[in-house]
């Protein structure tokens, strides 16, 4: 049985209080919400607000980062 804290294997992020921060391996396809307790699920925008993205706000992955082509979201 796959580790529920490892969404790279399961394809779903089931991170919760029961998943240790170091045990949840979230991949690029893992769209974790703000209520996700796993540190590995958190991503931040590494772009400037001039590009249309307020860094660290409502950015849960590359798909939600509304910036120029040089923008990237990273863990």
UniProtKB/Swiss-Prot annotation:
The modification N-acetylserine is found at residue 2. Keywords: Acetylation, Cadmium, Metal-binding, Metal-thiolate cluster. Cd(2+) 5 binds at residues 47, 53, 55, 59. Cd(2+) 4 binds at residues 45, 59, 65, 73. Cd(2+) 6 binds at residues 55, 67, 71, 73. One of its GO terms (molecular function) is metal ion binding. It comes from the Eukaryota. Cd(2+) 2 binds at residues 19, 24, 38, 41. Cd(2+) 3 binds at residues 26, 30, 32, 41. InterPro entries: Metalthion_mollusc. Induction: By cadmium. Cd(2+) 1 binds at residues 15, 19, 32, 36. Belongs to the metallothionein superfamily. Type 2 family. The metallothioneins are involved in the cellular sequestration of toxic metal ions. This is Metallothionein.
């Amino acid at each position: 049985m796959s580790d529920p804290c490892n969404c790279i294997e399961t394809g779903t992020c089931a991170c919760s209080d029961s998943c240790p921060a170091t045990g949840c391996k979230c991949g690029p396809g893992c769209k974790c919400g703000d209520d996700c307790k796993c540190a590995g699920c958190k991503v931040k925008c590494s772009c400037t607000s001039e590009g249309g993205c307020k860094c660290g706000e409502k950015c849960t992955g590359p798909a939600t980062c509304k910036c120029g082509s040089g923008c990237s979201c990273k863990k």
